[in-house]
UniProtKB/Swiss-Prot annotation:
Reactions catalysed according to its record: D-ribose 5-phosphate + ATP = 5-phospho-alpha-D-ribose 1-diphosphate + AMP + H(+)
Required cofactor(s): Mg(2+)
Biological or metabolic pathway of the protein: Metabolic intermediate biosynthesis; 5-phospho-alpha-D-ribose 1-diphosphate biosynthesis; 5-phospho-alpha-D-ribose 1-diphosphate from D-ribose 5-phosphate (route I): step 1/1
InterPro entries, per the entry: PRib_PP_synth_CS, Pribosyltran_N, PRibTrfase_dom, PRTase-like, Rib-P_diPkinase, Rib-P_diPkinase_bac
Places the protein is found: Cytoplasm
A single GO cellular-component term on record: cytoplasm
Annotated ATP binding sites: D40, G41, E42, R99, Q100
Keyword Kinase carried by entry: yes
GO molecular function, one term: ATP binding
Species the sequence originates in: Xanthomonas axonopodis pv. citri (strain 306)
Protein's name according to its UniProt entry: Ribose-phosphate pyrophosphokinase
């Protein structure tokens, strides 16, 4: 193994188990830092070891509670920069606020993904590493290099192992996800592709799900970047089963799973939901028989190693 004495990994409180798994994959210990709260709730951070001239990686998804976790990340970066770290890479497995990435129809709303990116850059982070951004263009909101790595190799390997490619069809849950679904289908021996076209015929009429493609008697694999309340996902599963699908499974990178998500999944016709550990699961999600979690620790550890030693990251994804 290459010399990793100048590589340090720190973590906020958002996803300590993932950070520990990454350290184990890298063969390094977790950096010593106090990340807690003052009595009034303000974030308190103290780096408890020297980081001078070290290559530092801070692992902190900005999942719920988003504001607190983002603030922890910002304060950690600032503390490390002030302690003379050679470079600080913000490792953000799930980049919260990413869905607020544009002004629809020029409405009077913020572009919060840009706000979060500017705040991270203002703390003088040297680089950002993230997984499956909601939109690739968000990389342009940052003034520093961004490595947006994809969980697809991990998810594809599991699809091959669990379901094979016989009688399988990849399904995009909406028109916007067609590019992602097509890429997955290509890697599954050019599997068939179906698209769910959601539309509301007129005001006060329920949304209709039109399925473009033949799913009769097939195992349907829905692919997407995140699942929130799972309402749309569960409705899609019901529509696919109604059209004769044999089985409906979903492979989704980020398990936001807010509100009634777990209940929705338990009561749905979805056979299995496979997610990653970019966001920690709640107790209800961990005990849900339909939810299975894969780890991105090995993927992120290898990417961190390549960044630290000046190797290509893009070659991880060359076909």
């Amino acid at each position: 193994m290459q010399d990793q004495r100048n590589l340090l990994v720190f973590s906020g409180n958002a996803n300590k188990p993932l950070a520990q798994s990454i350290c184990k994959e890298l063969g390094v210990r977790m950096g010593k830092a106090l990340v807690t709260r003052f009595s009034d709730g303000e974030v308190q951070v103290e780096i408890e070891e020297s980081v001078r001239r070290q290559e530092v990686f801070v692992i902190q998804p900005t999942c719920a509670p988003s504001a607190e976790n983002l603030m922890e990340l910002l304060v950690l970066i600032d503390a490390l920069k002030r302690a003379s770290a050679q470079s600080v890479t913000a490792v953000i497995p799930y980049f919260g606020y990413s869905r607020q990435d544009r002004r629809m129809r020029s409405s009077r709303v913020p572009i919060t993904a840009k706000v979060a990116a500017k705040m991270i850059c203002a703390m003088e982070a040297d680089r950002v590493l993230t997984v499956d951004l909601h939109a690739d263009q968000i990389q342009g909101f940052f003034d520093v290099p961004v490595d947006n790595v994809y969980a697809s190799p991990l998810l594809l390997a599991d699809i091959w192992r669990a379901y094979g490619t016989d009688n399988l069809i990849v399904v995009s849950p909406d028109v916007g996800g067609v590019v992602r679904a097509r890429a997955v289908a290509k890697r599954l021996d050019d599997a068939d592709l179906a698209i769910i076209d959601k539309r509301r015929p007129r005001a006060n009429v329920a949304t209709v799900m039109n399925i473009i493609g033949d799913v009769q008697g097939k195992t349907c694999v829905l692919v997407d970047d995140l699942v929130d309340t799972a309402g749309t996902l569960c409705a899609a599963a019901a529509a696919l089963k109604q059209r004769g699908a044999l089985k409906v499974v979903a492979y989704i990178t980020h398990p936001v799973l807010s509100g009634p998500a777990v209940d929705n999944i338990n009561n749905s016709q979805l056979d299995e939901l496979v997610v990653t550990d970019t966001i920690p699961l709640s107790e209800a999600a961990r005990t849900c028989a339909k939810i299975r979690q894969l780890s991105v620790a090995e993927l992120l550890a290898e990417t961190i190693r390549r960044i630290a030693f000046g190797e290509s990251v893009s070659s991880l994804y060359v076909d």
